[in-house]
């Protein structure tokens, strides 16, 4: 005997749906983690066309904008390459091209690299006056630990969410009801080396060579990344993490595999 199946009409009244009830409740909630709903992802061009193409995706079947090229807002990107291959140069230029069109966008960087001095950043980024540099870059080269990395990401997140209209811009898109979609202007955070984010106590004690320290550091870094990702997405922050890796000498290339990029040179 065939089982009777009830077929529901997809064109039901919106106000009778669970989606309507949920949005009606959370719209009264001041906690943006509950009331903010994703409507669109924006890709930000980096100035490297091959890189932007690999990160692109189709966004509309109709209208003027059919493709979104560049790095999506809220992304975390790992850039891998051996020492001296150009990771810092690559990330600095990408970051500058992402933030340049926006009024409030800033590049935060944790770096201990001696060669990447202010003058070199100014040259690479094109922000070559003191006023432009001060507006666009916030650099830290001491006190970098797992805890302070998380604290700075959270601080950026909290500042933007506390005054959203100050940091938002009109994307040029509209939602299903015809209302303009306004999103946070992108922020870029560069971490010079993933190895910098070690626990506070291990940095103070100098326990960097024991097996226990390595295991503990890995656990802390995993936890930090897990906690950082939602804040990056909410505050439209793009994070570049660099990792030194010894490789055979190859021609310069960028290899894409799930937000993992390889940068090497002759």
Functional labels for PLM-detected ranges:
Residues 128-140, 185, 237, 248:
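A short helix-to-beta-strand connector/capping loop
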Residues 136-147, 202-220:
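Flexible beta-alpha connector loops of hexameric P-loop NTPases
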Residues 198-207, 232-233, 265:
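Conserved ATPase-coupling elements of RecA-like P-loop NTPase cores
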Residues 153-189, 228:
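Short amphipathic alpha-helices and their capping/turn segments at secondary-structure boundaries
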Residues 6, 214-266:
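Phosphate-binding/switch region of NTP-binding enzymes
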Residues 193:
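Walker B catalytic acidic pair
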Residues 76-78, 106, 186-188, 238-239, ...:
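Residue-level preference for the first positions of well-ordered beta-strands
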Residues 2-134, 138, 146-162, 166:
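The Walker A/P-loop phosphate-binding site
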């Amino acid at each position: 005997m065939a089982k009777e199946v009830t077929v529901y009409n997809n064109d039901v009244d919106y106000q009778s749906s669970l989606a309507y009830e949920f949005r009606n409740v959370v719209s009264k909630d001041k906690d943006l983690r509950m009331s903010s709903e994703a409507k669109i992802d924006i890709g930000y061009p980096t100035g490297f066309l091959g890189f932007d193409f690999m990160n692109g995706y189709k966004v509309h079947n109709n209208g003027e904008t059919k493709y979104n090229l560049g790095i999506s807002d809220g992304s975390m990107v790992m850039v891998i390459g051996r020492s001296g291959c150009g990771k810092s140069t690559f990330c600095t230029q990408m970051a500058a091209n992402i933030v340049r069109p926006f009024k409030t966008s800033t590049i935060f960087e944790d770096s201990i690299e001696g060669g990447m001095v202010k003058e070199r950043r100014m040259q690479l980024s094109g922000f070559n006056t003191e006023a432009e540099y001060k507006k666009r870059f916030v650099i830290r080269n001491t006190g970098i630990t797992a805890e302070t990395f998380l604290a700075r990401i959270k601080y950026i997140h909290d500042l933007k969410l506390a005054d959203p209209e100050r940091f938002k811009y009109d994307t040029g898109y509209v939602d299903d009801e015809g209302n303009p979609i306004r999103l946070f202007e992108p922020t870029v955070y560069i971490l010079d080396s993933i190895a910098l984010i070690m626990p506070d106590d291990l940095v103070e004690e100098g326990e960097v060579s024991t097996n226990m320290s390595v295991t503990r550091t890995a656990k802390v870094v995993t936890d930090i990344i897990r906690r950082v990702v939602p804040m990056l997405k909410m505050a439209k922050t793009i994070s570049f993490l660099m990792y030194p890796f010894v490789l055979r000498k190859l021609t310069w290339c960028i290899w894409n595999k799930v937000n993992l990029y390889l940068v090497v040179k002759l």
